[in-house]
Amino acid sequence: MAASTFSAKCTEPRWVAQSRPKSSARSPYDGRTSKLAFLRAPRLGCSARRSRNLCVITNVASNQKQDLKEPFNQEDDAPDVFIPDPVSIASSIKYHAEFTPSFSPEKFELPKAYYATAESVRDALIIKWNATYDFHEKMDVKQAYYLSMEYLQGRALLNAIGNLELTGAYAEALKKLGHNLEDVASQESDAALGNGGLGRLASCFLDSLATLNYPAWGYGLRYKYGLFKQRITEDGQEEVAENWLEMGNPWEIVRNDVSYPVKFFGEVVTGPDGRKQWIGGEDIMAVAYDVPIPGYKTKTTINLRLWSTKVAAEEFDLRAFNAGDHTKASSALKNAEKICYILYPGDESVEGKTLRLKQQYTLCSASLQDIIARFERRSGDQVGWEKLPEKVAVQMNDTHPTLCIPELIRILVDVKNLSWEEAWKITQRTVAYTNHTVLPEALEKWSLDLIQELLPRHVEIIKMIDEELIHTIIAEYGVEDLGLLKQKLKEMRICDNVELPASVLELVVKEEDTSPDEEVIVALEEEEEEEEDQEEGEEEEEEEDQEEGEEEGEGEGEDKPTDEENDQVIEAVTAIDKVSFDPDPKQPKLVRMANLCVAGGFAVNGVAEIHSEIVKEEVFNEFYKLWPEKFQNKTNGVTPRRWIRFCNPDLSKILTKWIGTDDWTINMEKLSLLRKFAYNDDLQLEWREAKRKNKMKVAAFLKEKTGYSVIPDAMFDVQIKRIHEYKRQLLNILGIVYRYKKMKEMSPEERQRSFVPRVCIFGGKAFATYVQAKRIVKFITDVGATVNNDSEIGDLLKVVFVPDYNVSVAEFLIPGSELSQHI
């Protein structure tokens, strides 16, 4: 499309000014005042029309459904909210094109149109965002905090205006300005904050939390280059930095007034008051960047707070810089900034492992300091720390945020001066853990020596937690059977291959000292001495025999151990020798993060029913026997707004038409109403037409991205996820090779009778240092190059690897897929 131009008086948009409240307590976000009423979204299955009644939300961390109460109505206090129309929206876009430019002002081309449009939408989000925050502050509700190393968000523009119910208005406004909404939206880069299902789950959770009006925030890291941008060449996968922030991110608001210190290395000393102090080392600052997350058909807009890292200005060595040593002058800054350079830096080296651990601790430390600061502010002059679990729930998405547990204890004990017992009880009631894998080798383990060097105070705390756990295990199983105890400790301890604490050794040694077999052992030793004496000679032996006879006569009634008893004693001695609690010097000392999560939190959940059962019966079976009340299931889902309503509009229209309502977008159980129409010819025809239309989009997309042509009438067989041996892309492609081999063995007529045309689509990234996964990518692309150029096979079989798979690619592929491979 040719570049558009426009001219208008660029003043602040009318709808922004009219939406701004007249008076309120100061909002912590942008300095503006806000007292917008917090309007309740419809309950699941209810009408889309919303009440203006305020709601109180309680019981956030409960397993039960959230109760929405309506204690009062402040309709009179609520400002008159102005709903933007296309004219007002066009004015807003013009305003931002002029006054918040990301490009030169001469032309209103697509990139500039996108940034101006995004800024316009952000204005609408901030109004609701401030109102949500103010309401949560006023009501002092319990708040959930979701910590994740990944957020795989996808593009934000269409999702935001869809949730705001402004898609049509923005499409019309952009049309007035000479652009198409889809073309403008295509200019947006996916936020490079995640890679796989872990990050997509986190993003879907935030969307659903906002839609259901839960008081919740997300916390993550603001990666400058994401994981990487994937290119597919004749050599397979190549990685390049994904500079998604090159032109800035219009959805984020930098919060330079919100920053927290984060410390690494150093040493632990005991202060004059007897309390531990972590001093020295390397200090950085974590700075907040906020991203509004709007709910669907609700005024609720929650927050995703991302941390970026830097150092204080005084850390810049001006003297070294002026002396010409520029590397030394900026070394502190570079060390801080690289923490947030990329997601999952290679960990083959010690430096890589250290950087990953720095990332995890930065997320935990900055987030907890922020959470506690908010709790203290809401508590006023009297802070009751015992009430922290009643106001705060911290959910750890996988084991990456595990350091939340020792960090929360450190803050409570070292900074807030609570006792160990108080801090430990509070932590156990505040933190919860989501498990994502049942593979034992995939459960995170960190070198104790590495953590000791980087986070010395946390190692002390982790060892104390380990000691608490050991005493709990001993209380459950006792010390009578040392073999059983050793087995339980081997499976359950947090510190693996580490010496037992002194308090535990006392119990074990005491049990060994008071063993009932001790008298029998002494008798056996005496008998061995007698046998040695017998070898000295016949005369001495006879004399000794006479003496022994006399002694036996004197001590008549005392029994010597029988051979059978002696054998039992030998077995007992051997068994005790085998029960050694000493660490193996040949094996590394490790911290098992998953065990720390289970011991340190109040809940552990799997992400599917079968997964949760495996977690209970296999992965953490010993913990389940000890604390069955901790284990629960939370089946993963996806937001139907992004994944059906917005990316598959043709199917959405069909669902709404036949169900009779669009309530399925917030209550998927409504889709069950389609069952009665399953054999309706009209529905089936509409469904097939929508699917074929989506497949034609996929075919055009594949042609653009890979150069391969596919027919939309073939079956689209899709496997899109990160490349890993346990994800079994190798098994899939070997099956395709077998199919190809069978086709080649047949005549053309036999092939046509035996096979349905099939397009096998792969997508996903292999980690840069994961050699075997990269070989799988190479193998898939090589098979594709062979099969796709075989004129004998033609359209019967195609193999396509889509480069740089992300959410936006998935939004193309999923609506057109017919078989999704999960093997």
Predicted regions mapped to residue ranges:
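A conserved ligand/cofactor-binding region detector
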Residues: A2-R20, R26-G31, L36-E539, D545-I823
